[in-house]
Amino acid sequence: MRKIKRNDEVIVITGKDKGKRGKVNRVLSDDRLIVSGVQIIKKHQKPNPQMGIAGGIIEKEAPIQASNVAIFNPATNKADRVGFKLQEDGNKIRVFKSNGEAIDA
C-alpha cells in the first residue's frame, strides 16, 4: 500500500516550489508524482496538424520526487507523515501520525 495516492492533497517540503500545495494527479511507478500547480516547466511543442496540436511554448507539470512532498493534514494545517493501522475487520488504513485520524474516510 502506498503512502501517497491519487487525489491526496500534498505540500512540497523541499525544492524550488517549497510550501506550495496541490492535488496528486498521477502516481508514477518510480516514486514520482505529478502534482497540480507544482514543478511547472515550459515545453516547446512542435505543431502536429494531424492530431490537432498547435505549436508553441506550453506550460505543464513535471514529475516531482515523492520524498520531496508530504501529505497535508487539514486538521493541523501542516505537513504530516503517514502511518498504517489495522482495523478489527483486517483492513489496513492510512492514518496521520500526528493525531491518528484516518486519511481514507
Swiss-Prot record:
A single GO cellular-component term on record: ribosome
SUPFAM superfamilies found in the cross-reference section: Translation proteins SH3-like domain
UniProt keyword list: Ribonucleoprotein, Ribosomal protein, RNA-binding, rRNA-binding
Gene3D superfamilies the UniProt entry points to: 2.30.30.30
One protein family per Pfam: KOW
Disulfide pairings: none
Domain of life, per lineage: Bacteria
UniProt entry tagged with the keyword Ribosomal protein: yes
Recorded GO MF terms: rRNA binding; structural constituent of ribosome
GO biological process terms on file: translation
Described purpose of this protein according to its UniProt entry: One of two assembly initiator proteins, it binds directly to the 5'-end of the 23S rRNA, where it nucleates assembly of the 50S subunit. One of the proteins that surrounds the polypeptide exit tunnel on the outside of the subunit.
NCBIfam families (alphabetical): rplX_bact (TIGR01079)
Quaternary assembly: Part of the 50S ribosomal subunit.
Family membership noted in the UniProt record: Belongs to the universal ribosomal protein uL24 family.
Protein name per UniProt: Large ribosomal subunit protein uL24
Organism: Saccharophagus degradans (strain 2-40 / ATCC 43961 / DSM 17024)
Phylogenetic placement of the source organism: Bacteria, Pseudomonadati, Pseudomonadota, Gammaproteobacteria, Cellvibrionales
